[in-house]
Regions:
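Bacterial Sec-dependent N-terminal signal peptides
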Residues: 1-32, 497, 501
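Outer-membrane beta-barrel translocator/receptor signature
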Residues: 46, 58-67, 73-151, 223
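Outer-membrane beta-barrel porins/channels
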Residues: 29-43, 48, 117-501
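Alpha-helical transmembrane segments and their juxtamembrane interfaces
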Residues: 20-21, 78, 417
């Protein structure tokens, strides 16, 4: 299982810090993007998922092409694998005392692989060479989240998203964004008081009392097309290398609506502000690995992943609509922004992986991986000097840190059936921060299990993986506004069908 938006706890905190700048310019890249596109959770086959992805020292599974390419050299026959997967993501939010649930279901392709093995017939020296080509899913961003609540009139603690627009317009009148303030002004939501010399909004003037709703729809993922070569030396030493082509897709559709349901705000009825971000990218990477069997019981593996170099294109736009008490409820104003097209480059951190596995004959396997990566090494480049990416790179170095990931799994052989279980821990890429007076970390724990059936020519594997995450989400600044507490439950059910030949 690969967590969906696992960096969200920190990403939302970053929104708090960066939101004051958000209204000044078009959307800028930040450390949240760097983390999102750098994290890999190795979906692959159902067997690998059931064992927590701990295949760095095992091999003999197409997931190895993306994890430790030396595992391709372990193959002693050719095979084809196909792994469709059902994603189920459920979120529950608590905002202003109200609990709201949302969900998303989707089928994806986790794996499609072809391995061709050529044995030499020798037990000493070069015993075989294997070529693999195929696809492994590395990360998924699919999630829906809904928040609802009512700002209590006259409480002294209420707020509105329009306060952001108004405050920024008054604090920075010389900076006017076509994506934010201009839309609020054109939708008649932010009038100007020429006597006071400032902008204002109906909701704040009336003392609040409006209902709020925000829905975030995220989709996409990262997949790797892997071209792998593996070799077997004396059935003790295995080598492998992968050239990987990554395809990245990420979409975020956010709509924020506020309504005067109680009819206590003069003139104002409702407004909706929408943000759309669509991201596509292609990246290239190279991986190399080794597996050593000092004795038949033990396997030791090591792998190194060079940084992935992405070229990314983003399309970003917003729109705002409003209705007032003197109309029929249809949008009296609808104001779209221009579409901003932006291209940039991202270099992700390298990864180093150490693995060990114990094989108890044909009875059982126990395996574990340790993975290290330093998120501070992520780097943006626009091939220009006017997009502020140099400042974002400084922020990456200051906000992010190195992280350790640990995966463990076990498999028990019971006749034609195999029972599997696994767990994985992905360390937080963020330095400790304060949220509501408490330290928070964006680490992830995933539990998994499954079973498999194998014959000489055909095998079928099933897996189930579950992740639970909790994080805070602030809809807007100021920082002392009420945040939403989000609980996410992500499940993946995968099935792999394979044929040996």
């Amino acid at each position: 299982l690969y967590p969906i938006n696992t960096n969200k706890m920190k990403r939302i905190y970053a929104i708090i810090i960066a939101a004051s700048f958000m209204l000044l310019t078009v959307r800028a890249q930040n450390e949240s993007d760097a983390v999102r596109y750098s994290q890999n959770f190795y979906g692959g086959t159902a067997r690998s998922m059931a064992m927590g992805g701990a295949f760095g020292a095992l091999g003999g599974d197409f997931t190895s092409a993306s994890l430790n390419p030396a595992g391709i050299g372990v193959y002693r026959s050719s095979e084809i694998t196909f792994t469709p997967t059902l994603l189920s993501d459920n979120t529950s939010s608590l905002y202003l005392g109200k609990t709201t649930r949302d969900n998303r279901y989707q089928f994806i392709l986790n794996n499609l692989g072809l391995v061709h093995s050529k044995l030499t017939g020798k037990d000493q020296g070069w015993a075989g060479i294997t070529f693999g080509v195929g696809y492994n899913q590395l990360n998924s961003f699919n999630r829906n989240t809904m928040m609802k609540g009512i700002q209590i009139s006259g409480s002294g603690e209420s707020s509105s998203y329009l306060d952001n627009f108004t405050n920024n317009a008054n604090a920075n009148p010389q900076v006017w964004s076509d994506y934010y303030e201009e839309l609020a002004r054109a939708a008649n939501l932010m009038p100007y008081d020429s006597i006071a010399g400032e902008y204002w909004n109906d909701i704040r003037e009336a003392g609040y009392g409006q209902s709020q709703r925000r829905r975030i729809q995220e989709s996409g993922g990262i997949g790797e097309f892997a071209f792998t070569l593996g070799a077997n030396y004396s059935n003790k030493l295995y080598f492998g290398a992968t050239f990987g082509i990554h395809r990245l897709n990420y979409s975020n559709y956010t709509d924020h609506t506020e309504i005067d349901d109680a009819g206590i705000i003069p003139y104002f009825n409702s407004f909706t502000f929408r943000e759309t971000l669509e991201t596509k990218g292609t990246g290239y990477t190279f991986k190399a690995g080794i597996i050593y069997r000092p004795i038949s019981l033990i396997r030791i593996g090591a792998a190194f992943h060079l940084p992935t170099f992405y070229k990314i294109r983003e399309d970003f736009y917003t729109d705002m609509s409003s209705t007032f008490d003197d109309n029929t409820g249809e949008p009296e104003y609808f104001e779209p922004s221009p579409i901003n097209h932006f291209e940039y480059w991202l270099r992700t951190p390298y990864k180093a992986i150490g693995s060990v596995a114990v094989q108890l004959g044909k009875l059982a396997i126990i395996s574990a991986d340790y993975e290290y990566m330093d998120y501070r090494l992520a780097n943006f480049d626009s091939r220009a000097t006017d997009y502020g990416l140099l400042d974002q790179n400084d922020r990456i170095h200051n906000v992010l840190k190195s992280a350790s990931n640990i995966r463990a799994g076990a498999e028990v052989h019971l006749g034609p059936m195999y029972l599997r279980t696994g767990a994985s821990f992905y360390g937080s890429p963020y330095r400790s921060i304060i949220e509501n007076g408490k330290n928070s970390d964006a680490w992830n724990i995933i539990m998994s299990g499954g079973l498999g059936f194998r014959s000489n020519k055909v095998f079928f594997d099933l897996s189930y993986a579950r992740r639970v995450s909790d994080y805070q989400y602030w809809l807007y600044i100021p920082e002392d506004s009420k945040g939403a507490s989000i609980s996410g439950h992500n499940q993946q059910m995968a099935a792999t069908l394979g044929f040996r030949f």
